[in-house]
Amino acid sequence: CIRDRAFDPDDSNTFYIGTWFEGIYKISGTECVGHYTSLNSPLSKGWAMAVPNIVFDRDGNLWIAHAGDVGVSMLPKAKQSIDTDELKASDWYQFGYSEIKNNKYAKLLIPNHSTAKWVVYGDWPGSIFAFDDKGTYNTIADDRTKNIVSFMDQDNKTFTPNYYTCIEEDNNGQIWIGTSSGPIVITNPDHVFSDSFRCTRIKIARNDGTDNADYLLQNINITDIFVDGDNRKWIGTRESGLYLVSADGSEILNHFTAENSKLPSNHVTEVIVDPVTGVAYIGTTSGLAAYRSDAVQSSDDYSNVYAFPNPVRPDYEGWISVTGLMENSLVKITDTAGNLFFQGYSNGGQISWDGRDRSGNRVKTGVYLVFASSSGSSKQSGVVTKILVVN
C-alpha cells in the first residue's frame, strides 16, 4: 500500500515511494532501482516499516517520517547515490525525539520560508511537534523543540482538537494545519518557540446585521489541504466533501459534494492541483475525480502564454483559458479594431473568458488579441497571445 511519494529535485525521472510495511522504493523511470528496509535504514521490521511521509529539503536531503522508534530520519544528498545493497543504517541521520515515536500517521513539513520543521502526530491524542535542528544533524542535544497538544488562539482561547490531520505551507509562508475540528493558521512560524506564540482561527462574518462570526469550517473534520497557484486553499474533509477557500481564508469560494458535483464521495482523502493545467485531482474513498480550476502557477514573464481551446469552434460553449501569465496580471481581450470585450486579473498564472462580450453576447467570428501587464514587474507587456473564434 502506497503512503507517499516524492520526486528527486535534481532528477524528475526519479522518485521515492513510502509504503505500509515495505519501507521505501526508489524508482527511476519505470524500474525499481533501490529498496530501503530495516537492513539499510533506521526503519524497523513489521508495521514499523511504514513510511507515511517523504520530503526533500532545499539542499536535496531526503527526509522521512516513519512509524518506528526514531520518528524522523534523513538521508543526505551525498548518500542517495549509494546502491541500497551497500547502504547502512548509519548513513542516515536519526532524530529520536520521544514525542514523535511510533507515529504511523505522521505528516512532515519542511517549510520554504521559515526555519522550524513540523511533524503532525496523527494518532490519538494528537499533537504538533516543531523542531529546529540548527543544521547539526549528528546530534539533537542542541535542538530547539516544542510539542503542542493545545494551541492558544489570537483571542487567548485554548483550542484542543482530538486529532491533527495535515499540514501545508502557503505561498506567503503561513502554515495551515488541518484538525478534526477545522483548520488553524500559523501566521508567524518562526515564533513557534516563543512564549507569545499563537495560532489564528479564521473568522467569517455572518453578514446578518450583527457582529457575530463563525470560525472557518468549525467542527468539520479536515483530511487534506492543498495550496494552488493563486494561494487559495483546497480543503478536503471526512464527511463534507471539498471546500475551496480564498487565499486568506475569509471566503468560501466553492463547496463540492457528492450531491452537487461529480465527486464520488464526501470523504475526501487527498487533493492535488496540477500547477501547469490548474486541474484539481480529488481522491475519495469511492474513487478519483478531476476538476479544471482557474488558478495555475504564475510565470516569471510572458514568453510562454497560450490560450485553450484555440481555435474556439462553433460547438464549444465552455470557458476559454489563457495560461502562462505572470502573477495577478491585468488581462484585456480586444478585437483587431481595439474594441474591449473582456478585462480582469489572473488567478496565479491563468484567467478564463467565456467568449462573450460585455453585454453577454457570444462574440463574432474573428481574431481576438490578449493583452497582459503586471504592475509588479518591469517586464515588457502587450499582446501576449491571440484567440481565433469561429462561429
Whereabouts are the PLM-identified features?
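Blade-level signature of beta-propeller repeat domains, shared across WD40, Kelch, NHL, RCC1
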Residues: 183-184, 266-300
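Glycine-centered coil/turn sites that cap beta-strands in beta-rich domains
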Residues: 301-332, 350-353, 378-381
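Short, glycine-anchored, charge-dense loop/turn motifs used at functional sites
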Residues: 330-341, 368-370
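Short loop/turn segments immediately following beta-strands, especially the blade-tip
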Residues: 29-33, 75-87, 130-143, 186-199, ...
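Short, surface-exposed loop/turn motifs with a glycine/proline- and acidic-biased composition
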Residues: 346-379
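Residue-level detector of functionally pivotal "anchor" positions at catalytic/ligand-binding pockets or at interdomain
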Residues: 289-317, 340, 390-391
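Conserved beta-propeller blade signature
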Residues: 14-17, 25, 61-65, 116-120, ...
